[in-house]
Protein backbone atom coordinates (compact mmCIF):
# COMPACT_ATOMS: atom_id res chain seq x y z
CA UNK A 1 0.00 0.00 0.00
CA UNK A 2 1.31 3.43 -0.94
CA UNK A 3 0.45 5.36 2.21
CA UNK A 4 1.67 8.64 0.67
CA UNK A 5 -1.08 8.51 -1.98
CA UNK A 6 -4.07 10.27 -0.40
CA UNK A 7 -6.52 8.62 -2.82
CA UNK A 8 -5.72 5.10 -1.59
CA UNK A 9 -8.70 3.67 0.28
CA UNK A 10 -8.10 2.61 3.85
CA UNK A 11 -7.79 -1.17 4.29
CA UNK A 12 -10.28 -1.08 7.18
CA UNK A 13 -13.18 -0.80 4.74
CA UNK A 14 -14.47 2.59 5.89
CA UNK A 15 -14.59 3.90 2.27
CA UNK A 16 -12.37 6.81 3.36
CA UNK A 17 -8.85 7.43 2.13
CA UNK A 18 -6.13 6.02 4.38
CA UNK A 19 -4.80 9.53 5.12
CA UNK A 20 -8.23 10.56 6.49
CA UNK A 21 -8.95 7.29 8.27
CA UNK A 22 -6.40 5.05 10.02
CA UNK A 23 -3.17 6.89 9.20
CA UNK A 24 -3.56 9.53 11.96
CA UNK A 25 -3.92 6.72 14.52
CA UNK A 26 -0.92 4.91 13.06
CA UNK A 27 1.03 8.16 13.51
CA UNK A 28 0.14 8.40 17.21
CA UNK A 29 -3.24 10.16 17.50
CA UNK A 30 -5.45 8.32 20.03
CA UNK A 31 -8.34 6.36 18.53
CA UNK A 32 -11.71 7.91 19.34
CA UNK A 33 -13.57 4.68 20.18
CA UNK A 34 -13.06 0.90 20.44
CA UNK A 35 -14.31 0.35 16.87
CA UNK A 36 -11.88 2.97 15.55
CA UNK A 37 -9.00 1.27 17.36
CA UNK A 38 -10.05 -2.15 16.07
CA UNK A 39 -10.25 -0.84 12.48
CA UNK A 40 -6.84 0.80 12.82
CA UNK A 41 -5.39 -2.44 14.17
CA UNK A 42 -6.87 -4.38 11.25
CA UNK A 43 -5.22 -1.88 8.88
CA UNK A 44 -1.96 -2.35 10.79
CA UNK A 45 -2.20 -6.13 10.26
CA UNK A 46 -2.76 -5.54 6.52
CA UNK A 47 0.26 -3.21 6.43
CA UNK A 48 2.35 -5.47 8.71
CA UNK A 49 2.82 -2.63 11.21
CA UNK A 50 3.80 -4.66 14.29
CA UNK A 51 5.03 -1.57 16.14
CA UNK A 52 1.54 -0.02 16.11
CA UNK A 53 -0.12 -3.30 17.07
CA UNK A 54 2.14 -3.68 20.10
CA UNK A 55 1.71 -0.02 21.10
CA UNK A 56 -2.10 -0.38 21.11
CA UNK A 57 -2.10 -3.71 22.96
CA UNK A 58 -2.71 -3.39 26.71
CA UNK A 59 0.43 -4.02 28.79
CA UNK A 60 -1.27 -6.78 30.82
CA UNK A 61 -1.82 -8.98 27.74
CA UNK A 62 0.74 -7.66 25.20
CA UNK A 63 3.18 -10.22 23.77
CA UNK A 64 6.87 -9.34 23.91
CA UNK A 65 7.12 -9.41 20.11
CA UNK A 66 4.90 -9.92 17.09
CA UNK A 67 6.06 -11.61 13.89
CA UNK A 68 3.79 -10.79 10.95
CA UNK A 69 5.94 -12.25 8.18
CA UNK A 70 3.80 -15.38 7.81
CA UNK A 71 0.48 -13.57 8.19
CA UNK A 72 -2.19 -14.36 5.62
CA UNK A 73 -3.22 -11.83 2.99
CA UNK A 74 -5.99 -9.94 4.79
CA UNK A 75 -8.62 -8.90 2.25
CA UNK A 76 -11.64 -7.38 4.00
CA UNK A 77 -13.19 -6.53 7.33
CA UNK A 78 -16.78 -6.77 8.52
CA UNK A 79 -17.72 -5.09 11.81
CA UNK A 80 -20.72 -6.92 13.23
CA UNK A 81 -21.22 -4.86 16.39
CA UNK A 82 -19.41 -2.35 18.59
CA UNK A 83 -20.23 -0.91 21.99
CA UNK A 84 -18.67 1.34 24.58
CA UNK A 85 -19.59 1.68 28.24
CA UNK A 86 -17.42 3.94 30.36
CA UNK A 87 -13.82 2.75 30.14
CA UNK A 88 -14.70 -0.62 28.54
CA UNK A 89 -15.49 -1.44 24.95
CA UNK A 90 -16.41 -4.47 22.86
CA UNK A 91 -16.18 -5.11 19.14
CA UNK A 92 -17.39 -8.19 17.27
CA UNK A 93 -15.85 -8.50 13.81
CA UNK A 94 -15.00 -10.91 11.03
CA UNK A 95 -11.80 -10.49 8.99
CA UNK A 96 -11.39 -12.36 5.71
CA UNK A 97 -8.10 -13.56 4.29
CA UNK A 98 -6.53 -15.45 1.45
CA UNK A 99 -4.00 -18.17 2.23
CA UNK A 100 -2.51 -19.90 -0.77
CA UNK A 101 -5.38 -21.04 -3.00
CA UNK A 102 -7.98 -20.93 -0.23
CA UNK A 103 -10.02 -18.41 1.71
CA UNK A 104 -10.66 -18.16 5.41
CA UNK A 105 -11.96 -15.89 8.10
CA UNK A 106 -11.12 -14.97 11.66
CA UNK A 107 -14.05 -13.98 13.86
CA UNK A 108 -13.41 -12.27 17.17
CA UNK A 109 -15.28 -10.79 20.11
CA UNK A 110 -12.68 -8.24 21.29
CA UNK A 111 -12.40 -6.42 24.60
CA UNK A 112 -10.91 -2.93 24.87
CA UNK A 113 -10.03 -0.73 27.82
CA UNK A 114 -9.44 3.00 28.05
CA UNK A 115 -6.51 4.20 30.15
CA UNK A 116 -4.90 7.62 30.21
CA UNK A 117 -7.23 8.86 27.47
CA UNK A 118 -6.26 6.04 25.07
CA UNK A 119 -8.06 2.88 24.03
CA UNK A 120 -6.12 -0.40 24.14
CA UNK A 121 -6.86 -3.88 22.84
CA UNK A 122 -7.12 -6.15 25.88
CA UNK A 123 -8.13 -9.62 24.65
CA UNK A 124 -10.50 -11.50 22.42
CA UNK A 125 -12.32 -14.76 21.89
CA UNK A 126 -11.54 -15.96 18.37
CA UNK A 127 -12.67 -18.63 15.98
CA UNK A 128 -11.51 -19.37 12.46
CA UNK A 129 -13.06 -21.07 9.49
CA UNK A 130 -12.58 -21.84 5.83
CA UNK A 131 -14.61 -20.22 3.07
CA UNK A 132 -15.64 -21.91 -0.15
CA UNK A 133 -17.17 -19.10 -2.18
CA UNK A 134 -19.44 -20.08 -5.06
CA UNK A 135 -18.95 -18.53 -8.48
CA UNK A 136 -21.92 -16.16 -8.01
CA UNK A 137 -21.22 -15.29 -4.36
CA UNK A 138 -19.82 -11.92 -3.34
CA UNK A 139 -16.04 -12.05 -3.51
CA UNK A 140 -14.46 -12.42 -0.05
CA UNK A 141 -11.87 -9.79 -1.01
CA UNK A 142 -14.48 -7.12 -0.30
CA UNK A 143 -14.62 -5.68 -3.82
CA UNK A 144 -18.39 -6.02 -4.03
CA UNK A 145 -18.10 -7.98 -7.28
CA UNK A 146 -19.06 -11.60 -7.88
CA UNK A 147 -16.33 -14.12 -7.10
CA UNK A 148 -16.30 -15.45 -10.69
CA UNK A 149 -15.33 -12.05 -12.16
CA UNK A 150 -12.98 -11.07 -9.35
CA UNK A 151 -10.58 -13.32 -7.46
CA UNK A 152 -11.62 -16.65 -8.99
CA UNK A 153 -9.65 -15.59 -12.07
CA UNK A 154 -6.45 -14.88 -10.13
Positions of predicted regions on the chain:
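Core segments of small alpha/beta cavity-forming domains
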Residues: 24-65
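Cysteine-centered loop/knuckle micro-motif
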Residues: 20-22, 148-151
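Glycine/tyrosine- and acidic-biased, solvent-exposed loop/turn segments at the edges of beta-strands
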Residues: 3-8, 25, 29-30, 131-132
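Sequence context surrounding c-type heme c attachment/ligation sites in exported
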Residues: 154
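Short beta-strand edge/turn micro-motifs at domain boundaries
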Residues: 107-133, 149
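Surface-exposed, charged secondary-structure patches
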Residues: 70-105
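Long C-terminal interaction/binding lobes of large macromolecular proteins
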Residues: 55, 59, 90-92, 103, ...
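Short Cys/His-rich zinc-binding micro-motifs
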Residues: 3-16, 135-144
Amino acid sequence: MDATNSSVLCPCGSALGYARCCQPWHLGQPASAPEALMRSRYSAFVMKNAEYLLATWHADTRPSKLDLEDSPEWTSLQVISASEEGLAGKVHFRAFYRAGEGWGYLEEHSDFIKEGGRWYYLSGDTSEGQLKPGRNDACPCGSGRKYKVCCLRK
